[in-house]
Structures are given as C-alpha cells and as structure tokens.
Amino acid sequence: MKAYQRQFIEFALEKQVLKFGEFTLKSGRKSPYFFNAGLFNSGRDLARLGRFYAAALMDGGIEFDVLFGPAYKGIPIASATAVQLVEQHDVDVPWCFNRKEAKDHGEGGNLVGSPLKGRIMLVDDVITAGTAIRESMDLIQANGASLAGVLIALDRQEKGKGELSAIQEVERDYGAHIIAIIQMGDLIAYLEEKQAEQPELAVQLAAMQAYRAQYGI
C-alpha cells in the first residue's frame, strides 16, 4: 500500500465516509463496511479528495485527453481532480460533465465544459452495478470518443450477480482500465497494520476477511 492510499483510508475514516460495522447493501448482502463519498461535503474535503484522485490518476499511468464527470456525483469529483492535477502535478487537462436532461435553449445540449472527444477518463465515486458507466458510454460513443479508463475512489473487489465484479464486467465490455484509489484488499491490509496497536480491530478484520472469502474476486 502506498502512502497516499493509507492517508486516503484515514481521511475517509476521519470524515465517516468509511465505516466498519454491519450494513445491508442494496443487493441485500450484509457488508462489514460502508463507503459514502457524499460525506466529503466541505471545500477542504473536496480539495483533499481531488488530491487523492489526482495522485491515483498519475500513479495509474493511463493516457487520456478529457476528464468526464457523470451527473451528479461525478461532477464535483472531476472538477476537484482537474484542479489538483494542475496544482500538484502541473498537468492541465480539459474536463466536462453531462446534464441529466438536455437543455433546449441557450447553449443547448447535454454536455457542459470541454467537448467530449478523444480518450475519455471517466471519474466517479464507486462502481456498484456499472449502470452509470453504461449510460456514460452511450454519450461517449455518440460524440465519437472512446473510454480510456475509469477513475474511482473504491474498488469493492466483490462478485456481482455472476462470478465477475461490476468493475471486471466494465473492463471486459469496454476494454477500459479501472483506477481505484483503494481496494477492499487495502482496507484489510490497513486493519492488519493497525491491529497491533488497536486489538479491538480484530473483530472488524475477521469480518472483512470472511466477507472477502464469501464474495471476493
């Protein structure tokens, strides 16, 4: 695990974006952890979040032309990432987002910002079922662009309805690379590191390991 990944886990815990416990997911599964990126909800949080996304993007090494943030959650993340790519890495890239409903007046259309062309890096919080990716692909392809990759905060590394995870299905269907700031394996490694000084984490660690054994890929 790299330093920025460990720092991101601690940031997510500090903001209660990441919680350990018992949570029922939309799928009906009982999960030993929950991740809600909507709780990164201040200016400082968003600036820090953008730095982590930018670090992961630079670390991933995938070439792209435009950052795209799908409405709604992807919009502030793509914006913050674009800002921090300049501030932290001196990399200036165009970015854009879509409207849920196209305007029929003014500038019109359903895209705001840079034209959606070339190799697109889609930016979002997590991939759960891959629905947002598939909807975005319709827009990307309609503009004659291609999907270079997907940048997310967390890869849960768990099976969907079949043997593949939603992320693996996206990789298979679109040939796109997925970059995640952290994966479930990083959360387990973090708990293993911290258990020596915080023995009470043993329960959470065991629950995470059991969950991975049952649903992991």
Curated annotation (Swiss-Prot):
E.C. number: 2.4.2.10
GO biological process, one term: 'de novo' UMP biosynthetic process
Cofactors named for this entry: Mg(2+)
A Pfam family reported for this protein in Swiss-Prot or TrEMBL: Pribosyltran
Domain of life according to the entry: Bacteria
Gene3D superfamilies: 3.40.50.2020
GO annotation, cellular component aspect: cytoplasm
Pathway it works in: Pyrimidine metabolism; UMP biosynthesis via de novo pathway; UMP from orotate: step 1/2
Family: Belongs to the purine/pyrimidine phosphoribosyltransferase family. PyrE subfamily.
Physiological role: Catalyzes the transfer of a ribosyl phosphate group from 5-phosphoribose 1-diphosphate to orotate, leading to the formation of orotidine monophosphate (OMP).
PANTHER family referenced in this protein's UniProt entry, alphabetically: OROTATE PHOSPHORIBOSYLTRANSFERASE 1-RELATED
Name of the protein in question: Orotate phosphoribosyltransferase
